């Protein structure tokens, strides 16, 4: 169980749920610029395994690093923290 605590855990927003058992999660982070010392926003998309297809487009989710599940999937869904409001 201690090995799982060393895995990376990110929080992001689902931007695509069109694939079966796979979602695309956009994770936004901030880094400081070396020269100017200003915070710069970076974003990255991760393909994530969603076994039961519970996450929908716009949901805020937590994902965890795992073994390679396919050519592009390296993360799995931990939980849906906030559901999207559908208007």
From Swiss-Prot:
InterPro entries: NA-bd_OB-fold, Ribosomal_uS17, Ribosomal_uS17_bact/chlr, Ribosomal_uS17_CS. Keywords: Ribonucleoprotein, Ribosomal protein, RNA-binding, rRNA-binding. NCBIfam families: PRK05610.1, uS17_bact. One of its GO terms (molecular function) is structural constituent of ribosome. The keyword Ribosomal protein applies. The keyword Manganese does not apply. GO terms for cellular component: cytosolic small ribosomal subunit. Pfam families: Ribosomal_S17. It comes from Oceanobacillus iheyensis (strain DSM 14371 / CIP 107618 / JCM 11309 / KCTC 3954 / HTE831). Belongs to the universal ribosomal protein uS17 family. Transmembrane segments: none annotated. GO terms for biological process: translation. This is Small ribosomal subunit protein uS17. It comes from the Bacteria. Gene3D superfamilies: Nucleic acid-binding proteins. Part of the 30S ribosomal subunit. One of the primary rRNA binding proteins, it binds specifically to the 5'-end of 16S ribosomal RNA.
